[in-house]
């Protein structure tokens, strides 16, 4: 009988990752059948999708509340199918709110479970470790320090590296990126990434734009380039930009990035420095070896929730940006909340743009980080999944 694997991915990044893992599984176990919830990358590998990936996609708390009936219906159907015909192993890829609950019920019923992409318990809500311990037979993690964390907690774990490290080149080509974007080869370029969510753009864009205006005042030749994930976010950003004008500001979307490289990556690669919202984009910037200033601002009500939670639980890491977390150091500046004033952002970013010796040092540190994260992620993940399935056979 062929190997059957249940699988749920809830976001495009998870779909891309899962598609590569399925390819790794097929190379090691011909005839393997994977089914559950997934997207086009998984479908291209023969994945049987019971529900489309967007069935799990929500945008903020209001949307999540509205989607509760459909989410519960999807959850119930997937759980029923997997309990009726238990797979050899179930693999949940990210989407922890959905997958950890499902994994717990499947594991109680005797199905081994693997969870890929550990929740950021090291940054927020560490108490989730108890839920993970009960739900997950084996964790697959992206970062080296996570492996030690889960081992300490008695949870079987495999460090498989970060897939971005295998996609982003070890040696970026600034000239090629500028050619793709139509930017002068000798220009000084600042990439501005205020986030991909409406709430992030609303809170960060005014500060980033005011900082950029000050930087252009200092150096009128400076080119500020803003990549946007889609036309909707671009329209939101440009509406704010009309209130905070920056001479020569350029906003680009995917069609202008030319080629398969995400437009944000092209802009990072083309830049001399990056002013970036905390999130995955900070890791992408580090893999492109660019100096950066990391910033983030929460809404007032979210700040109150975070302040309350920080008083209830153990203290967290002193760093917010992923590059600093991974390097265990303030390798690049972080300006958060009230510290994220336009003046402070401008000063820190000016330093990133003009300090050539500092740029060389950070390039060396980010190159070492890139090498540390570079593994054959699909192969390692596939091997671990098959070992869990074999152990349960």
Curated annotation (Swiss-Prot):
Pathway noted in the entry: Bacterial outer membrane biogenesis; LPS lipid A biosynthesis
One Gene Ontology term of the molecular function aspect: phospholipid binding
Range of residues in the leader sequence: none
Cited InterPro entries: Glyco_trans_19
Catalytic EC class: transferase
Keyword Lyase: no
Tagged with keyword Membrane: no
GO cellular component terms attached to this protein's record: membrane
Record EC number: 2.4.1.182
Pfam families attached to this UniProt entry: LpxB
Protein keywords: Glycosyltransferase, Lipid A biosynthesis, Lipid biosynthesis, Lipid metabolism, Transferase
A GO biological-process term: lipid A biosynthetic process
Catalytic reaction equation(s): a lipid X + a UDP-2-N,3-O-bis[(3R)-3-hydroxyacyl]-alpha-D-glucosamine = a lipid A disaccharide + UDP + H(+)
Chain's role: Condensation of UDP-2,3-diacylglucosamine and 2,3-diacylglucosamine-1-phosphate to form lipid A disaccharide, a precursor of lipid A, a phosphorylated glycolipid that anchors the lipopolysaccharide to the outer membrane of the cell.
Alphabetical list of HAMAP family matching this protein: LpxB (MF_00392)
Family designation: Belongs to the LpxB family.
Listed name of the protein: Lipid-A-disaccharide synthase
Organism: Bordetella pertussis (strain Tohama I / ATCC BAA-589 / NCTC 13251)
